[in-house]
Swiss-Prot record:
Disulphide bonds in the chain: 44-155, 79-104, 235-296, 255-313
Site (Cleavage): 319-320
UniProt-listed Gene3D superfamilies: Zona pellucida, ZP-C domain
Source lineage: Eukaryota, Metazoa, Chordata, Craniata, Vertebrata
Extracellular side: 20-372
Protein name: Zona pellucida-like domain-containing protein 1
Keywords: Cytoplasmic vesicle, Disulfide bond, Extracellular matrix, Glycoprotein, Membrane, Secreted, Signal, Transmembrane, Transmembrane helix
Parts of the chain that traverse the membrane: 373-393
Length: 415
């Protein structure tokens, strides 16, 4: 009788839990609780901010998906989420497009981060922080027995990316150069192009560039006479728009150069040019797309003195270095950090494709079941044939020496 009562209680509990979750992909044993901080996931993507909220705990708290809205905009259907019941647990998804990030009252705060480049130049980057919340409406009564739900989120991006995330942003820098007869100011720009003609600027599709796509970069100067050239000291990449990011990958620095990077022109004219193949940062391994920002530390140098400011890499240049004359402090200007990006790259989802991108495209040799069986049969047949050939030879070899040592009676006829 006690067992029947226990079974009846368990059945009632399961039925009540199923009724409470209304057939959604929830577990009454796991999700019969109020929401916690772990019930929201925030993804700061390259084109949108995505929030996923555990819908099961929302149901347990007595609310539905229509009760959740961005920043208290419960009367605006565009500020609500939608349910995805194909996951466990079921979730409510909110998506904020970066192109319309302030549509539902999200807050954008701009701050400036100071920094110092490798050459000691002071740099600053403007960062845009997007923040907001998702909540339930206040009840019309004085008291309520339902808990109020509140989920907060925040994402940070380079400001130039938020201004127009559909196009590449490029920074410029003004360099002041002092001469004997005065001072002039030249403006430098870092631009990205599709091909080696440098006619059409780089256009990135919404799905991103495939890995190993070749991108052509150019540093150009304006308001510059023929006595001065552009010299790129070094160029590197970061996953964010901050040139001082702790994660960086050098494309070329002094005599060291990335194997996929080609310096086309540097220090020989009023434009520096190079190309490189796009990649993804490993820190973006859980994302379908990766962001790459390009930075170049650049200066102006006198056309006659630029070769002397280039790094000495070959043995001949080292031998001839002693013949070089000294130059004055007016031979070059101060350095400036130029940035461009983001370059959005997409990663193939299959590991095989990723590994093939970094190796020669030689199709791997694979054995199917039939081929393996044929090879195995040929090996067995060869072993048996070899055994049949070796055994008689071994017997003959064993009998031969024995017959040679046989002794008989001497025949007198041969005397």
């Amino acid at each position: 009788m006690e067992q029947i009562r226990l079974l009846l209680l368990l059945t009632i509990r399961v039925l009540s839990g199923s009724a409470q979750f209304n057939g959604y992909n929830c577990d009454a044993n796991l999700h019969s609780r109020f929401p916690a901080e772990r019930d929201i996931s925030v993804y700061c993507g390259v084109q949108a901010i995505t929030m996923k909220i555990n819908f099961c705990t929302v149901l347990f708290s007595g609310y539905s998906e229509t009760d959740l809205a961005l920043n208290g905009r419960h009367g605006d259907s565009h500020c609500r989420g939608f349910i995805n019941n194909n996951t466990f647990p079921a979730v409510v998804i909110f998506i904020i497009n970066l192109s319309t990030l302030e549509g539902c009252g999200n807050n954008l705060v701009v701050s400036t981060i100071p920094g110092v480049s490798a050459y000691g130049n002071a740099t600053s980057v403007q960062i845009g922080n997007i923040s907001g919340y998702i909540d339930t409406p206040d009840p019309p009564t004085i008291i309520s027995y339902l808990p109020g739900l509140l989920y907060k989120f925040s994402c940070s991006y380079p400001l130039e990316y938020l201004v127009n995330n559909t196009q590449l942003a490029s920074s410029s820098a003004a360099i002041s150069v002092r001469e004997n007869n005065g001072t002039f100011v030249s403006t430098l720009n870092l631009l990205l192009y599709n091909d080696s003609t440098y006619n059409q600027q780089l256009i990135i599709p919404s799905i991103g560039l495939p890995l190993k796509t070749k991108v052509f970069a150019a540093v150009q100067a304006t308001n510059l006479d023929g006595r001065w050239n552009v010299l790129m000291d070094y160029c590197y990449t970061t996953p964010s728009g901050n040139p001082n990011d702790d994660i960086r990958y050098d494309l070329f620095l002094s005599c060291d150069k990335d194997p996929q990077t080609t310096v086309i022109e540097n220090g020989r004219s009023q434009r520096g040019r190079f190309s490189f193949e796009v990649f993804r940062f490993v820190k973006h391994k859980n994302q379908k797309m990766s962001t790459v920002f390009l930075h170049c530390v650049t200066k102006l140098c006198r056309a006659d003195d630029c070769p002397f400011l280039m790094p000495i890499c070959s043995h001949r240049e080292r031998r001839d270095a002693g013949r070089r004359t000294t130059w004055s402090s007016q031979s070059s200007s101060g350095s400036a950090v130029l940035s461009a990006g983001p370059i959005i790259t997409r990663s193939d989802e299959t590991p095989t494709n990723n590994s093939q991108l970094g190796s020669p495209s030689v199709p791997p040799f694979q054995l199917n079941a039939i081929t393996s069986a044929l090879i195995s049969g040929m090996v067995i047949l060869g072993v048996m044939s070899f055994s049949l050939l070796v055994c008689p030879l071994a017997l003959l070899h064993r009998k031969g020496p024995t017959s040679l040592v046989l002794n008989g009676i001497r025949n007198p006829v041969f005397d």
